[in-house]
């Protein structure tokens, strides 16, 4: 298909799905995760990757969207998802056996046109069939990278046509022998880095404590890549155990930053009210 961009083809505003974090929506520059695009969320273990995705799923469902969760890690917790506001009974869940099966399911869901958001958790768990059927200790160099490269070539066109948001969760690995620069890299080769319109680096920066009891994590998200707005912005928010992103805490922090709320010591005041 070929078209001339002379105005006859109506240019529409970019549709987005909120992340559930006000600060992160602002950092993304467009108000959320862009539809019709691929998004990669990566970070260390227990940094809040799945929580952030489930928060976005809950926001999508709130606006009448249909969501699917491809759980390659076989670790989906419906009780926790429900606490974050996910309507579990309306969520399509798949727990595939192989990487090929997971990506085929993802492609089928996208091509159907009936799904608004697909989450793949995680790229590291997309094990090629040859590796599953082989013996422990067998060498399968580059198999997963080749699988991801082929799948993304197929997926990217369908994602644009159906205006579906596809989020890939990814893990971090260390490169051996790196003297300069960061030794960290993500799994599954380089293809996902190229095909992603947005890449988010999520890190746990500290703990939220009440006395000795740990109530949650302080979290920082950096927008490492952004094709729809300026990149390298960042957002900080709290993730409370069993509750998810602390919306009230984030609202107060943004209010203080923009001089809407006054802070003096441990007190916050707005229009004279403390």
UniProtKB/Swiss-Prot annotation:
Taxonomy of the source species: Bacteria, Pseudomonadati, Pseudomonadota, Betaproteobacteria, Neisseriales
Keywords from the named record: ATP-binding, Cytoplasm, DNA damage, DNA recombination, DNA repair, DNA-binding, Nucleotide-binding, SOS response
Keyword DNA damage appears in the UniProt entry: yes
Name under which the protein is recorded: Protein RecA
Positions with a binding annotation for ATP: 43-50
Protein's GO biological process: DNA recombination; DNA repair; SOS response
Subcellular location: Cytoplasm
Pfam families hit by this protein: RecA (PF00154), RecA_C (PF21096)
Gene3D superfamilies: P-loop containing nucleotide triphosphate hydrolases (3.40.50.300)
Cellular component GO terms held in the UniProt record: cytosol
Protein's UniProt keywords contain Oxidoreductase: no
Function as written in the Swiss-Prot or TrEMBL entry: Can catalyze the hydrolysis of ATP in the presence of single-stranded DNA, the ATP-dependent uptake of single-stranded DNA by duplex DNA, and the ATP-dependent hybridization of homologous single-stranded DNAs. It interacts with LexA causing its activation and leading to its autocatalytic cleavage.
Transmembrane segments: none
GO MF term (any one): ATP hydrolysis activity
Family (UniProt): Belongs to the RecA family.
SMART domains, per the entry: AAA
């Amino acid at each position: 298909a070929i078209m001339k961009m002379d105005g006859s083809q109506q240019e529409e505003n970019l549709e987005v799905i909120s992340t559930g974090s006000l600060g992160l929506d602002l950092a993304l520059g467009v108000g959320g995760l862009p539809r019709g695009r691929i998004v990669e969320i990566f970070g260390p273990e227990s940094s809040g990757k799945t929580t952030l995705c489930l928060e976005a799923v809950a926001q999508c469902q709130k606006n009448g969207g249909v969501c699917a969760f491809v759980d390659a890690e076989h670790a989906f917790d419906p009780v926790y998802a429900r606490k974050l506001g996910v309507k579990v009974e309306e969520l399509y869940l798949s727990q595939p056996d192989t990487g090929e099966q997971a990506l085929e399911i993802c492609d089928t869901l996208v091509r159907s046109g009936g799904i608004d958001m697909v989450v793949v958790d995680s790229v590291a768990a997309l094990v090629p069939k040859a590796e599953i059927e082989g013996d422990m200790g067998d060498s399968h160099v580059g198999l997963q990278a080749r699988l991801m490269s082929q799948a993304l070539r197929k997926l990217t066109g369908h994602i644009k046509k159906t205006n579906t948001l596809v989020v890939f969760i990814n893990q971090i690995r260390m490169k051996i022998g790196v003297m300069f620069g960061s030794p960290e890299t993500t799994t599954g080769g380089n293809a996902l880095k190229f095909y992603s319109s947005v890449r988010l680096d999520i890190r746990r920066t500290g703990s939220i404590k009440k006395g000795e009891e740990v109530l949650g994590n302080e979290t920082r998200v950096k927008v490492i890549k952004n094709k729809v707005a300026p990149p390298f912005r960042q957002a900080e928010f709290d993730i409370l155990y069993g509750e998810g992103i602390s919306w009230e805490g984030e609202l107060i922090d943004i209010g203080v930053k923009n001089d809407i709320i006054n802070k003096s010591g441990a007190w916050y005041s707005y229009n004279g009210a403390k």
